Amino acid sequence: MQDSSSSNYSSNRNFVMMLVILFLMEFARGMYILSYINFLPTVTSIAIAITSFAFSIHFIADAATNFVIGFLLKKFGSKLVLTSGFLLAFISLFLVIWFPASPFIIIFSAIMLGIAVSPIWVIMLSSVDERNRGKQMGYVYFSWLLGLLVGMVIMNLLIKFHPTRFAFLMALVVLIAWVLYYFVNINLTNYNTKPVKAQLKQIVDVTQRHLILFPGILLQGAAIAALVPILPKYATQVVKVSTVEYTVAIIIGGIGCAFSMLFLSKIIDNNSKGFMYGVIFSGFILYTILIFGLSTITNIYIVWAIGLFIGLMYGILLPAWNTFMAGHINPNEQEETWGVFNSVQGFGSMIGPLVGGLITQFTNNLNNTFYFSAMIFLALAVFYGYYFIKTNRRVKP
């Protein structure tokens, strides 16, 4: 009994420490990717094309690394892979201190940071306790979201004092996360050293066995990300509000999401699989209605209310969807499978802004992008609603 309690304490301690490390790495990413490089064209001579490329290449590096990181963790072990990741992130952001507006360093650092964060995410997802997956995934996504947003906001404020003087803080945050890592005990599932050919075959096998999940993984990210390029223009030209009021809408949505992730996500663990299916289906339907509603509304107070509901729904839909995915994963292939899933999700997040921007540009109508995003969620609701009904019929005697 004592051994069991000690094991649970150690497991919980490791989980909390990994949450802190994830928060710090996302904090550094928020500072650099969401704030620092976006402000560079306004305070230095660096071109917008350079910073835009750095932004895109960061997520390409992240997605590409996710595809193979699970296999690298199994082959070389978590210590070597994570230490290499922290080293790459620290060196790249340390170089920014000395070359704050160098195009090469800006792009190089964006790539290295994308690579470095990948193994932390895969280990984090693999270490979640299956008995409390909904609740713990709420904590994971809360740490991710909080890290990104707080890092971005703090860097935005610091840039107002001086555009580059506080760049050292990004490397410092990574260094703190690196030190904390040595106080964590990480256990991988089914550690092995398969040859490259066998690993490639396993990637194909993992992909083929989870094809039913790919539409949801890819298209959810694409549908949400498609709105990113048009939301500022929608706020200022359609709703006709200031950037401050637009920021308030984002904050309200973030608060709703945080509340849902921390307090509502745990209900996924305490209810049946049918309840989880209902949350996912309802989430897709509500997203369809709410996103479509944004295309017809010009009252900022209603927009704030919709933002709150979207945040609340996102905070419970994400853990529910994650629990649904986890039910399809072989326990001995968690790192490999989560890596492939994260990679597919990353590609969805990359193509979303591109498609959303092109739709708006060629149709010259912001509403068409809202329609596109809403239709994706409607298609997901129909697809997975049908799948859930079939699954429930199959398990009934």
UniProtKB/Swiss-Prot annotation:
List locations, semicolon-separated. Cell membrane
Biological process terms in GO annotation: lipid transport; lipoteichoic acid biosynthetic process
Cellular component GO terms held in the UniProt record = plasma membrane
Asked if the record carries the keyword Secreted, the reply is: no
Major site of localization recorded for this protein: membrane
Instruction: Tell me a Gene Ontology molecular-function term this record carries.
Output: antiporter activity
Q: Establish whether keyword Transmembrane helix is in the entry.
A: yes
* Pfam families recorded: MFS_1
> How is the protein disposed in the membrane?
Multi-pass membrane protein
What residues form the membrane-spanning segments?
15-34, 46-73, 80-99, 105-126, 138-159, 165-184, 211-231, 243-263, 275-294, 300-320, 340-363, 369-389
Q: Known PROSITE patterns for this protein? A: MFS
Q: Which domain of life is it from?
A: Bacteria
Which purpose does this protein serve, as stated in its record?
Answer: Proton-coupled antiporter flippase that catalyzes the translocation, from the inner to the outer leaflet of the cell membrane, of the lipid-linked disaccharide (anchor-LLD) that anchors lipoteichoic acids (LTA) to the cell membrane.
Q: What is this protein called?
A: Proton-coupled antiporter flippase LtaA
Q: Species name for this entry?
A: Staphylococcus epidermidis (strain ATCC 35984 / DSM 28319 / BCRC 17069 / CCUG 31568 / BM 3577 / RP62A)
